[in-house]
Amino acid sequence: MNEAKTLVIRGNLVDIINRRTFGAEISILNGHIGKVIPTGQDEGSYLLPGFIDAHVHIESSMVTPAAFIHAAVRHGSIGAVADPHEIANVMGTEGVEYMLDNAKGIPFYTWFGVPSCVPATIMETSGAIIDADETARLLEREDLHFLAEMMNYPGVLNKDPEVMRKIEAAKNAGKPIDGHYPLATGPKLKAYIESGISTDHETIYLEKGREKCELGMHVLIREGSAAKNFDALHPLLKEYPEQIMFCTDDAHPSFLNKGHINRMVKKSLDLGYDLYDVLRAASYNPAMHYKIPAGFLREGDSADFIQVNNLKNLTIQATYIQGTCVYDGEKCTLPFHKPILRNNFHTKPIPLEKLAVKAKGKQMRVIVCEDRELITKEELYPVHTFDGFVESDTERDILKLVILNRYQTAPPAIAFIKGTGLKLGAIAQSISHDSHNIIAIGVTDFELMQAINVVIKAKGGIAVSCMDEVTLLPLPVAGLMSDESLEETSRRYEEIEEKIKRLKSPMDSLQMTLSFMGLLAIPSLKLSNKGLFNSETFQFTSLFV
């Protein structure tokens, strides 16, 4: 019978609980730390607790959980608090179970929660419903650990029965409840927190962050592909070190390929913040809040840690999870297998004439967007017509915007958008928060039709059309994720981004901005597959005035 081998590693051990750093020799046996022996000398490299992303939608990386993990461990991450909200809106409970199954057995703390808002609103068509009864059933499971971001803050404040039943189910299960209330303040914020909600990752202003912390909330500093709030919020690290965590929320493939939570750790240390406070935010605080059984380099702990060259460059030399070296400084040591494909995509190709918009007035409401901003404005503009039909007008930067129901064949919803600067071609994609219908923008109806139909034929993806040429990033898993590795998906995503740049838009990420133009929960004027929607009055509105 083979005896388990003891692994011995030396380094300067960073003990964030006792706030000390010392040269040490640690022994690892059966996935746990056996002995920690001080050596009394500088050991060169440093041993730190592994990083945990405190809030992420893995689907936004456009790869499956297994592929996400492969990338994350390269950057020193050992866990992620994951809200499978995107796939749940497409496939419901089946989608949640798909994510669990895909991550199963991989040494990584993939800490999934139960999505709280499926569908996000009743003003659009999603692929599934997870009601209060189903939420309660899911929260009883041992592999689902929290109620994910409660975006329906009006429902909380107005004590909507369905919303309150979900919150009570989480309380009864003894599981934390995540929040989503960016501009909350005063009595409304207090009532929101008193309902049992304990975190918020949507904070964008420092004073709002301070107010939330004063009321006992945990504030997550977010630095991802879409929203970047670190520069505004980093003073909270010193002011409320026990209540701050780091998260990405959404990390697109090329972003995750280059870094993860390690980016914020390095930025914080470069700004001179206390090492132990920074590492608390990156590891200890999320582990304690979500009851993740990660180790912190103590005798008897699970052997979860990273080895870095120094505390300035933070070059990851190795990542260990449960005693297994999952990254050796050059490559991830975990095997990667092509995932099983699951989807919910039933619409048929759209004919050209369905994209025509007959002018029914002299002025129209236009969605005005800004690069990387979720909030839009409503402005009125004279219509630009040809033969009685409204067309895109690149001179005024007013382009046709289309949302098409992916779950069944139905007429498209069409509006017009200003701010993208698009001069050529069209883009269509099956990533459109939160219901993930097909959203498209284009200069000509032909290019719009071409891009949309390529996405439909592939049953998901991002397509860029210009003249007769179409480039596609296929996303065959729920129309949201690739079945390839993160590295390959990142390469193909960068190819798509390059094609988009050739369409002459000045935006940093038109694809990302486009994905939020159907997000009805965020003001002001957005497009649902059911029509143009005013998010402030929470009512549909007409295109023509």
From Swiss-Prot:
One GO BP annotation is: adenine catabolic process
Identify the cofactor(s).
Mn(2+)
Q: One MF term from GO for this chain?
A: adenine deaminase activity
**Which top EC class applies here?**
hydrolase
The enzyme's E.C. designation: 3.5.4.2
Q: Which reaction does it catalyse?
A: adenine + H2O + H(+) = hypoxanthine + NH4(+)
Listed A to Z, the keywords are: Hydrolase, Manganese
Q: Does the keyword Amino-acid biosynthesis apply?
A: no
Q: Which Pfam families match?
A: Adenine_deam_C, Amidohydro_1
Against NCBIfam families, the record matches this protein to: ade (TIGR01178)
User: What family name appears in the similarity comment?
Assistant: Belongs to the metallo-dependent hydrolases superfamily. Adenine deaminase family.
What is the protein's given name? Adenine deaminase
Q: Which gene encodes it?
A: ade
